Swiss-Prot record:
Protein localization: Membrane
Protein's UniProt keywords contain Phosphoprotein: no
GO terms under biological process: ceramide biosynthetic process
Keywords annotated in UniProt: Lipid biosynthesis, Lipid metabolism, Membrane, Sphingolipid metabolism, Transferase, Transmembrane, Transmembrane helix
Membrane topology qualifier: Multi-pass membrane protein
Protein name: Probable ceramide synthase lagr-1
Family in the record: Belongs to the sphingosine N-acyltransferase family.
Main function: Catalyzes the acylation of sphingoid bases to form ceramides, which are key players in cell signaling events such as extending lifespan and enhancing stress resistance. C.elegans contains specific sphingoid bases, which are unique or different in structure compared to the sphingoid bases found in other animals. Two examples of these distinctive compounds are: 15-methylhexadecasphinganine and 15-methylhexadecasphing-4-enine.
Length: 360
């Protein structure tokens, strides 16, 4: 690939830790047309879609990379099924309401995964001395200044392999394992976009931006699952009530909303989009063929984050007005369909559960 147009110390480069959103909007308004004009000069024979198809044919994964991801995806699916069987039995033994019996394994699995991968991502971004892309986002392009393809960090290779496998598993899980929700179709699309983003950024060696995307997302997912698990576990069919789960759930929900705004909306815009939609144009390779597609995917993910924040804001508003527990308002409203309140539904589900013969 052709080296960057500027180096990071050039006086015309706007370099900061966290970009001002208004300033960033003006920079992006200039950087995107600049990239297309420059690319037209570099590849005057480019025509859409034939040239893009030709570019896609030039990239591929090695057999070892592909098999590693597929094996990991299979392992994730096996572990998810195993955990589901074990925890559904556990929910019966611990008097969890039947309507939560399938939700507990799903949330516990996601909490385990997202918590683990985010801790590893935190280690990479905050504890590895070779770079500091979180506090200096434009520095993710420094290694391109030599003119060659930068060497990929082993931590990033681990992140990409594990996350790619998880999204392949998640496509299957959304269709066949997870509770279907109002936004499941959007989640399904999200998984494909995430896979496409991982693949294209990997073959273009834009892996540091990709690692930052994942770092800014997984902590809110983990906090959401803590919130959901707390409310699933606080009240039991034997009329026991665990107040500490209630308190933990409320605290986790508040933390979840704060993390979403800071990480997925503010820092995603002012660090990640600043470093990619603006920084990559001037500091990354000039002839990266998939830059427009990668940029579009990043913007789509941001739009999804804004859309999902709609659910969070509605939940906060409902809790503030009614004092009810923050429940997942993406789920299909069983109460409205049946005409029964949740307490009556729980009583009927519990009665039905008690009529079932117990396994010896």
């Amino acid at each position: 690939m052709l080296g960057p147009e500027y180096n990071i110390t050039h006086p015309s480069i706007y370099r900061t830790s966290t970009a001002n959103p208004i300033v960033l909007a003006g920079l992006v308004f200039e950087s995107i047309p600049h990239w297309f004009r420059r690319y037209a000069r570099l590849r005057p024979d480019y025509s859409f879609p034939s040239s893009m198809i030709s570019d896609f044919k030039k990239v591929s994964l090695s057999n070892s990379e592909l098999y590693t991801v597929l094996i990991l995806a299979s392992i994730f699916t096996f572990l998810r099924y195993y955990l589901q069987i074990r925890l559904e039995s556990w929910t019966q033994q611990h008097n969890i309401y039947p309507r939560f019996a399938h939700k507990v394994p799903e949330s516990f699995w996601k909490l385990t995964y997202y918590g683990t991968v985010w801790i590893f991502a935190f280690y990479f971004h905050m504890c590895v001395d070779s770079h500091d892309i979180f506090n200096d986002p434009l520095s993710m392009w420094i290694e391109w200044e030599s003119g060659g393809r930068p060497k990929m960090h082993w931590q990033v290779q681990v992140i990409y392999a594990v996350q790619s496998a998880f999204y392949i598993h998640s496509i299957y899980a959304t269709l066949f394992m997870d509770l279907w929700r109002k936004d499941s179709w959007l989640m399904f699309v999200h998984h494909f976009i995430a896979l496409g983003l991982l693949f294209l950024s990997y073959v273009d060696n834009f892996t540091l931006p990709g690692a930052l995307v994942l770092f800014l997302h997984d902590n809110s997912d983990a906090t959401l699952e803590i919130t959901k698990l707390s409310f699933y576990l606080k009240k039991r069919t034997n009329r026991q009530y665990y107040k500490y789960y209630f308190l933990m759930g409320n605290a986790a929900f508040i933390l979840f909303a704060i993390i979403w705004v800071i990480f997925r909306l503010y820092w995603y815009t002012c660090k990640l989009l600043y470093a990619t939609i603006y920084g990559a144009v001037y500091l990354g390779p000039q002839d990266a063929p998939f830059f427009p597609l990668l940029g579009a995917m990043l913007l789509i993910i941001f739009a999804m984050n804004v859309y999902w924040f709609n659910f969070i804001a509605r939940m906060i508003w409902r809790v503030a007005l009614t004092g009810e527990d923050p429940e997942d308002n993406r789920e299909w409203d069983t109460t409205a369909v049946s005409g029964l309140n949740q307490q009556k539904l729980d009583e009927l589900a519990t009665e039905k559960c008690h009529l079932k013969p117990k396994n010896v």
